Regions:
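Pocket-flanking alpha-helical
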Residues: 1-3, 19-24, 98-100, 123-125
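Hydrophobic alpha-helical segments within soluble ligand-binding/sensing domains
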Residues: 17-57, 144-154
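Short beta-strand elements in bilobed, periplasmic/extracellular small-molecule ligand-binding domains
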Residues: 33, 79-97
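An alpha-beta-alpha
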Residues: 35-82, 162-176
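Structural motif
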Residues: 93-109
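Hinge/cleft segment of the Venus flytrap/periplasmic-binding protein
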Residues: 150-193
């Protein structure tokens, strides 16, 4: 963004634009030559999912990479939502791939449920995380092209385009539910493998 103010820049899957661009009073529109889509899920809905699926859960581990500001933002918001519901949370932050396993083990030892935000390092280490949480019996809760067309055809001015969010469908991992003995809830769709 600092390299040009003339060429439209559309970001894809940026979780929190205000955080990523260090904008204190972010109102949904970046302005200038930047807009895009966010992969930010409805964090309150995710906190609700934890309490719906696991009503007996008292301690939720928040597993994330401390080097990713967008992950820290999500963790803070989910922690607030869970705290409002009377659920204790504890952060388990790894710094990179090298300490994912040890930090995940600590999270598994502490938690009734582990929450993992949209986090690049966690996503690339899904198997390592699952290999620790599953044996421990701890469950884990884990439109840009159209915008470009509007800019290129003159239908939209990028300086006035708000950040768009993808629509979410509540889903569950059927094989993981079976492995952990969890009965899927109504209103959720199984992830197709």
């Amino acid at each position: 963004a600092a390299a040009t103010s003339d060429i439209p820049i559309l970001g894809t899957s940026i979780t929190a634009y205000g955080v990523a661009l260090d904008i204190d009073d972010f109102n949904g529109t970046v302005g200038g030559n930047i807009s895009g889509t966010s992969d930010l899920a409805d964090l309150e809905a995710q906190a609700n999912m934890i309490t719906e699926w696991f009503p007996e859960a008292k301690k939720v581990g928040l597993l994330f990479c401390s080097a990713e500001p967008n992950s820290r933002y999500q963790i803070g918001e989910v922690a607030k939502c869970l705290s409002d519901k009377g659920i204790e949370t504890k952060e388990f932050a790894f710094t990179d791939t090298n300490d994912v396993a040890s930090v995940t083990q600590s999270a598994a030892d502490y938690s009734d449920v582990v929450y993992v935000p949209t986090d690049n390092t966690a996503a690339s280490n899904t198997e390592a995380i699952a290999n620790i949480l599953v044996p421990a019996g701890v469950p884990a809760i884990v439109t840009t092209g159209k915008m470009a067309a509007k800019i290129l055809t003159g239908e939209a001015d990028i300086s006035e385009m708000p950040i768009e969010f993808t629509e979410a469908t509540p889903k569950y991992n059927a094989s993981m539910c079976e492995t952990l003995g969890i009965e899927p809830l109504e209103g959720y769709t199984a992830i197709e493998e």
